[in-house]
Regions:
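Conserved short-loop catalytic and cofactor-binding motifs
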Residues: 6-10, 37-41, 86, 100
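Mid/C-terminal beta-alpha module of Rossmann-like enzyme folds, strongest
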Residues: 29-83
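Amphipathic terminal alpha-helices
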Residues: 99, 108-122
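Substrate-positioning beta->alpha
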Residues: 4-28, 33
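Hydrophobic "lid"/C-terminal helical patch
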Residues: 23-27, 53, 113-117
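A hydrophobic C-terminal alpha-helical subdomain
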Residues: 78-99
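Residue-level signal for the nucleotide or nucleotide-sugar donor/cofactor binding architecture
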Residues: 11-14, 44, 93, 104-107
Length: 122
């Protein structure tokens, strides 16, 4: 099988469970305001995220998702074609205010992805 995924849109995945825990922590303080929050672990493209999803799935005992059975092909947004949702090329966020106000950074997105795949019993 073959899957094409855009490689020129950059951001950081965010696990909703981790974000919800952060919101609970925020509610319990008086540090009101606007914050940017995403999982740690660096910026990646949608293509890189797809590759990691399938890598972790294969490592969890699903060989149908390994590189021998599934090819993930990087393409540009232009090559991919029209999408129903307009997406920014760069959706990186500055999260420095979180730590300045004493909040713990969210775990790495790779760890979050692994926890998510286990949660859904993938």
């Amino acid at each position: 099988d073959r899957l094409t995924v855009v490689d020129d849109q950059i951001g950081t995945p965010t696990y909703t469970y981790d974000l919800a825990r952060l919101l609970v922590d925020m509610i319990e303080t008086e540090n009101y305001g606007y914050y940017h929050a995403t999982n740690e672990g660096g910026y990646i493209s949608w293509y890189e995220f797809a590759v990691e999803i399938f890598r972790q799935a294969a490592a969890m005992g699903h060989p149908e998702y390994d590189a021998e059975h599934l090819t993930v092909v990087p393409v540009t947004t232009e090559e991919y074609g029209v999408s129903k949702a307009a997406r920014p090329f760069n959706s990186r966020l500055d999260k420095s205010k979180l730590t300045e106000k004493g909040f713990q950074p969210l775990p790495d997105w790779q760890d979050a992805l692994e926890r998510y795949l286990k949660e859904i019993e993938f």
